[in-house]
Amino acid sequence: MSFIKEFKEFAVKGNVIDMAVGVVIGSAFGKIVSSLVGDVIMPVVGVLTGGVNFTDLKITIKEAVGENAAVTINYGNFIQVTIDFLIIAFCIFLAIKAINQLKKPEKQEPKAPAEPNDEVKLLSEIRDLLKK
């Protein structure tokens, strides 16, 4: 089988396509939640904390000198990204929980009893013969 044919079979499998759709939707969902956090939630948190903009929080290790920029640790941006992650994770958790509740449990048909092996069949025949 040629390399191209193998790749084509791999690419058109349902799981790969489902995963690709999930990645695209997840990316769009991430942008929505990032906007929710950055544009709606964090301004409210900033007002509640006295007008603090978390993305501006930083520790300056070395001041700017001439054309050289200052060396900083931008921990405020880390706080912002962490809050984004927590909200995204919580939203995904709620979505999965809702989907699982909407799914109807599949009715499981009772399994047919397993067919006895040869030894059991032979013993049953002997028993039946002894009853006669």
UniProtKB/Swiss-Prot annotation:
Keywords: Cell inner membrane, Cell membrane, Ion channel, Ion transport, Membrane, Transmembrane, Transmembrane helix, Transport. It holds the Pfam family MscL. It is found in: Cell inner membrane. GO terms for molecular function: mechanosensitive monoatomic ion channel activity. It is a multi-pass membrane protein. It comes from the Bacteria. Its main location: membrane. The chain crosses the membrane at residues 10-30, 76-96. Signal peptide: none annotated. Channel that opens in response to stretch forces in the membrane lipid bilayer. May participate in the regulation of osmotic pressure changes within the cell. NCBIfam families: mscL, PRK00567.1-4, PRK13952.1. Belongs to the MscL family. Homopentamer. This is Large-conductance mechanosensitive channel.
